[in-house]
Amino acid sequence: NIVAHSRQVCLVSLLIVEHLKPDGLDRDLIRAAALLHDITKTRSFQTLEDHAETGAQLLLEIGYPEVGRIVGQHVRLDRYFASAVPTEAEVVNYADKRVLHDRIVPLGERMGYILEKYGREPDRKRAILLLWEKTEALEARLFAGLPFAPDDISRLLAEGHPGELPEPDPRL
């Protein structure tokens, strides 16, 4: 369920940004991008398009270029560690890597799923493994500034979280 997945990605993103609090990180922008990061995912099942690219393009076309810029990087960042402090795109990218369907999982479990689903060809497998090295480095970067460990995310969210999400539309 893409809606449940996106809500979980949003909660993980908000938990991280709540504790990072670097100057310049826009919480509302992170919330919007996390909720919309898979906006064209369903369509991509039929078209085989890159849903990060098509989602970014759609959001640009309807007047949300900043959200689209982040959505376009939720699978693969344009630049890793582009600034001294984490960016909105890095937060959403990482949060997406921690959510498998609607469950928060360790990076290793998510990588295993992605390799199984998308890494059957040797070139794709190599690209995924390289991407995962960058994701592990991103995790270390983010959590160097956080008062909790990656394995604490599920527990912290279960205990309650300061982020607010709208109730899901039952029609979705």
Give, region by region, the residue ranges found by the protein language model.
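Divalent metal-dependent catalytic cores for phosphoryl transfer on phosphate-bearing substrates
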Residues: 17-121
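Solvent-exposed, flexible loop/coil residues
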Residues: 6-7, 103, 111, 115, ...
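Charged catalytic carboxylate motif
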Residues: 8, 12, 54, 90, ...
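A positional/architectural concept
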Residues: 2-15, 19-20
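Charged phosphate-binding loop/patch that engages nucleotide di/tri-phosphates or the phosphate backbone
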Residues: 124-172
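General structural feature for long, well-ordered alpha-helical segments within catalytic domains
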Residues: 5, 51, 67, 131-134, ...
